[in-house]
Amino acid sequence: MGERCTVEGTVQSVIFQNEENGYTVLSLAVDGQEEPVTVVGCIPCAAAGEGMTVTGVWVEHPSYGPQLTAESVERRLPRDEADMAAYLGSGILKGVGPATAERLVERFGMDTLRVIEEEPERLQTLKGITAKRAMELSAAFRALTGLRQVMEFLARYELPVHLAMAVQRTYGDGAMQALRDDPYLLSREQYGVDFAVTDAIALSMGFGGDDPCRLEAAVLYELSHNLHNGHVFLPREKLIQAAAQLIGVETDAVELALDKLIERFGVVEKPIANVMGCYLPRLYQAETFVAERLVSMVKTPVEQLARVEKTIADIEQAQGVSYAPLQRQAVALAADSGVLLLTGGPGTGKTTSLRGIVTLYERMGLDVLLLAPTGRAAKRLGEVTGREAQTIHRCLGMSFNDLTGQVTFKKDAKDPLEAHAVIVDEMSMVDLELMRALLEALRPSCRLVMVGDPDQLPSVGAGNVLGDLLHSGVIPAVALTQVFRQAEQSAIIRNAHAVNMGQPPRLDSNQGDFFFLCRRSPERLVQTVVELCRDRLPKSMGMEASQIQVLSPTRRGECGTVSLNRALQAALNPPARDKAQKQWGDMVFRVGDRIMQTKNNYDVLWTRDDGTVGSGIFNGDVGVIEDIDPAGELLTVRFDDRTAVYTADLLAQLDMAYAMTVHKSQGSEYPAVVLVSAPAAPSLMVRGVLYTAITRARKLLVLVGDDGTPGKMAANDRQQRRYSGLRRRLKEGMA
């Protein structure tokens, strides 16, 4: 087993096939060999009767015996009439069974496939095949042929099969022609192929360096790529310069391409302050809608609650609390406003205020909906309020449009949420497009309370929604600033606020819940992190390793998450005979590993514990590998209350999560955090990263590394600018 070989033969039968991702198990009758071979791998649209040359590796399945795991497959059409009849009768064409297949081959022989594709009217000469049915068969066969052509084209450039299926869904029969006309379409958002790869494909096909397709693709790539940098738009001059630099051409040529895109593709150009901003159409629509809807909510009067102060006093008595002035103001403002922004750092009483607002709304007879951007944040929101909370995506009924490559939601203006009031926590994580989707799903009379910490890192997606709302001065807002006495006893909270004010955290050896261990060499630092997670914290604090999260500002370097994960996996989940594993590049996935999804994937299927089935695993979701099938082609991963199955071609989207970057930890809290303190890229050595990292720890934080880096980070309040027009549009809307 483990040997690589190449076999050639004819598909005898297809045992299993997943139409979503192409994963297939088939029996191959090998030329010159009596016993068939079981082949497993990504072989979409496989059918009995077709010929294949398969190159792969032998593995031993404990139940089914030897299997050839396909690495590459060359396919050919049936070579005789018997194979042709088997191929057509295999179910590859809906409605064509063995009997119809025999009749077709008997009539048209080896010319059958050409007749189906090019002369479908001749099929009507067979009894039972109408003109309509003949055209349906022809269309289905052309789609199948087209998919295979696209697969073969993309395979030459080592691009995955699921990409071929996505292109085929968009362009249908014209998919292959669309790729010939403009291979740069692969770099569009719904396909996500890196521009450099697409550019290499196009240039190898003979496209010129100044081809209009190339110029326009570079502009669109820069606009979509910079969404990941948080920009809603790009200034015209910066966009032109970036696109020209990307492909090495003069800016004049790119400027002409941009003008064409504005004319016919819908790229939007609008003045923002003193620059001309260029938007992708949907981002412009999102920005204008969010501004208009929020301004409308601010201006629209809401039903007032009689005797607000008396109600608040009753809530205080019932909950056994006494609100500070700002907390009382927040609860009262929630009663009188259609929209409210509640902000504050750790220990300032956001949770107490939030409970009060929820109770107030319930006493007003309002149906309250609690939401958060991530599953972990929603779970925590539910715990602190004692009510059910859910993710924004789940509440809105998120789905994915394969044709446009965009997320869609079932709930919108036509089918709004039933709630009278919606409360959203962790608003710093909400990007512009998610904000638009939420606002579209609210009834005109629905109240909205947004809660967050503006000093946390901004959303991964485009926009700086919380910051723009706060600094616009348009949205009624209460900023909680008082750190309460009980919270002041926590060194975690004291140090978080010190960092937020530009002061270095205190690095005393023992502060109860905040410890510092000085380790100047990378080797000793990594060794100490491993010891803390494997031995010291579990023994001294009674914590399981799963309750401890290692954070680092960076992925790269000796103290980055890649290096840390390698060491932590070896220490916490070493290989064992009874523990299945899968090699993927330079990574090994093993049963029991803590892993993280690194990009949004709307196609991964999952099943909840209650039997609910859905799809979509998102960037930052963390789970544990529960099972790896013996062939190494399927990984079962547990995400909180959901179980998802990954095929091998999706493993590139997974990473180890024993250690993660601070950015990936947004919206989460952990019982214990081990935070790496070591130099990294200048853009990461900033106050917001350190503040966010410290505030991830609930009970314990151990800072490991040099003693100079935390102070330097606290003193550096530089923030990467995000191009957004939301703040200005809000102000203009209220003018």
PLM regions and their residue ranges:
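Conserved helicase motor core of P-loop NTPases
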Residues: 454-615, 626
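Conserved pre-motif I regulatory segment
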Residues: 311-338
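A generic structural signal for residues embedded in beta-strands
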Residues: 14, 54, 597, 625-628, ...
